[in-house]
Amino acid sequence: MPLPDTFSESVRIAVIGGTGISALEAEGFTAVASLDIQTPYGAPGSPLTILKTPQNTPIAFLSRHGLHHELTPTEIPNRANIAALRSIGVRSIIAFSAVGSLQEHIRPRDFVVPSQIIDRTKGLRASTFFEGGLVGHVGFADPFDSELSKVVFDIGSDGVLNGEGVKMHKDALLICMEGPQFSTRAESNLYRSWGGDVINMSALPEAKLAKEAEIAYVMVCMSTDYDCWKTNEAAVTVETVMGNMHANGANAKHLAAAILKELAKEEHQDLVGAKHLEGLSKWACCTAPAGRKAEVVKKIEFMLPGYFS
């Protein structure tokens, strides 16, 4: 039976699934709606599935690469994804992503919470909501929300992850590359020389756009391989990635359920509501009211109503 296509409650938390996580199937979670939202930036990568947690908290789930993994990293409609989530009230995002490890101590099937990022995409992805008559410069010194990251790391370090020797790491440097091809060995070793810990293809501009939308954002990285720097390891292949991703999938769902249970507590409600980010984009706008193009203001106010008009 099809799910309802409307949902009247505000949804403050979203989970974005990446490679290997196209649905959020955790014990006690109940799907209650499926929303097809059209934004001024197009349609998101998948419908927004609204679920109720065992704590009766409504959350949104979005499959970054589409329901059938049909979107390459470059093709992901990042602006539509973030705008759609913010338009239904989302203020916190827990995003999952498969990554390659650039360091020996981060083993395949380990989980990582990054704190910094280096952008190695190639300018092919729309990376801002400020454009064409509306200029804004939102700070991005700390790309991942530190308080939300702490909650995620603490939960992940508390026996939630299954598997012998599986660890949760924090304060990692994430490299985001264009893809869809994997790195050359020279590139992989270059990123290691920069201090890179893990590498993926999807953190940007997702994290940048979330910050512009005043959404607290954290990425949970799931290590699938050693990229290709480790010469005594076979070069990374899709088969390697998908095999480890399958093993990571169950852990990701356990972790997501535990994080959402923790975030339902009263002590985290200001964090979940991103109170510390309110007004960030409004005050970052440099364009005088007389110079703001109405059509651009209308687009961005789809998710930030009344900010610039």
From Swiss-Prot:
InterPro entries: MTAP, Nucleoside_phosphorylase_d, Nucleoside_phosphorylase_sf, Purine_phosphorylase-2_CS. Its EC number is 2.4.2.28. It catalyses: S-methyl-5'-thioadenosine + phosphate = 5-(methylsulfanyl)-alpha-D-ribose 1-phosphate + adenine. Coiled coil: none annotated. Pathway: Amino-acid biosynthesis; L-methionine biosynthesis via salvage pathway; S-methyl-5-thio-alpha-D-ribose 1-phosphate from S-methyl-5'-thioadenosine (phosphorylase route): step 1/1. The record marks S183, V238 as: Important for substrate specificity. GO terms for cellular component: cytosol; nucleus. Disulfide bonds: none annotated. The keyword Glycosyltransferase applies. GO terms for molecular function: S-methyl-5-thioadenosine phosphorylase activity. Phosphate binds at T19, R64, H65, S97, A98, S202. It holds the Pfam family PNP_UDP_1. Catalyzes the reversible phosphorylation of S-methyl-5'-thioadenosine (MTA) to adenine and 5-methylthioribose-1-phosphate. Involved in the breakdown of MTA, a major by-product of polyamine biosynthesis. Responsible for the first step in the methionine salvage pathway after MTA has been generated from S-adenosylmethionine. Has broad substrate specificity with 6-aminopurine nucleosides as preferred substrates. Belongs to the PNP/MTAP phosphorylase family. MTAP subfamily. Homotrimer. HAMAP family: MTAP. This is S-methyl-5'-thioadenosine phosphorylase.
